[in-house]
A protein has these predicted regions:
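Juxtamembrane intracellular "pre-TM" segments in multi-pass secondary transporters
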Residues: 18-51
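C-terminal transmembrane helical hairpin of 12-TM major facilitator-type secondary transporters
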Residues: 120-168
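A membrane-interface helix-boundary motif in multi-pass transporters
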Residues: 5-6, 205-223
């Protein structure tokens, strides 16, 4: 009985010890979570944090609207104001030509920023992600029958988006620097998802209200917001350069 009591006592002590370790581990995880969220909002002066959040939420707002409607525009019938592409034509335009343009734009954007830094290429990238949206104004106005013209227009828009999106991704990395960088980058990507979701909620309603042509005109006008939020972000001139990153 004595041996059994001691054995039960040892088991109880181990259970209490294990529970204490688990509780301590949970407290440590919770503490780090709170600190990572707190430092995410306080890692810069309040004004710069606000500007950073506005940049992350609104830099891609026009693209958030365009992305939801452009695909529908390509396949919708001419009687509804669309280009009336067949499924095969649409697959080639978006799945081949568009992807090639997007990939090439992203590669060249990364090469440019790696050579000269994000700050130097910010404005060219802002122009690249906004001005090519004009091709959809042209397409919805001219309604071209030429499949080649449609492909060229989609390529231009996707290439510009790939090039301009580089600035956005690099800024997320820039803001995430410092302690808890992995957690901060995860929070930045949450804002990135929100930046596309919010415009998408109203894109369809707006298109039905004004039609394709005026919808794309509104998208181009809203590109002013992208220029505004980009004008106020503060970026280290050395950030993004390959040599600077290697030293880090």
């Amino acid at each position: 009985d004595l041996v059994r009591s001691r054995g039960l006592g040892d088991v109880y002590k181990r259970q209490v010890s294990d529970r204490g370790l688990r509780n301590a581990g949970a407290r440590e995880v919770w503490t780090k979570l709170v600190l990572s969220v707190k430092t995410f909002f306080t890692k810069m002066p309040a004004k710069q944090v606000l500007i950073a959040f506005l940049f992350m939420l609104f830099y891609r707002m026009p693209e958030g609207l365009l992305a939801k409607v452009s695909s529908l525009f390509l396949i919708d019938s001419g009687s509804n104001g669309g280009l009336g592409l067949s499924p095969q034509e649409y697959g080639f335009v978006q799945g081949t030509v568009g992807i090639i343009g997007l990939t090439l734009g992203g590669i060249l954007g990364g090469m440019a920023a790696g050579r000269d830094g994000l700050k130097k290429w910010l404005w060219p990238m802002v122009c690249a992600i906004t001005l090519p949206d004009l091709v959809y104004v042209y397409l919805s106005y001219a309604m071209p029958d030429s499949f080649i013209i449609i492909n060229v227009c989609v390529f231009i828009e996707q290439f510009g988006y790939g090039f301009g999106f580089t600035a956005y991704m690099l800024y997320l990395i820039y803001y995430s620097q410092g302690e808890y960088k992995t957690s901060h980058y995860a929070l930045c990507t949450a804002l990135m998802a929100l930046s596309m979701m919010l415009p998408g909620l109203v894109a369809g309603y707006l298109q039905e209200l004004v039609g394709y042509l005026w919808f794309f005109i509104i998208v181009v006008i809203l590109c002013i917001i992208t220029f505004l939020v980009a004008a106020f972000v503060d970026i280290d001139p050395e950030f993004g350069k390959k040599e600077h990153e290697e030293r880090q």
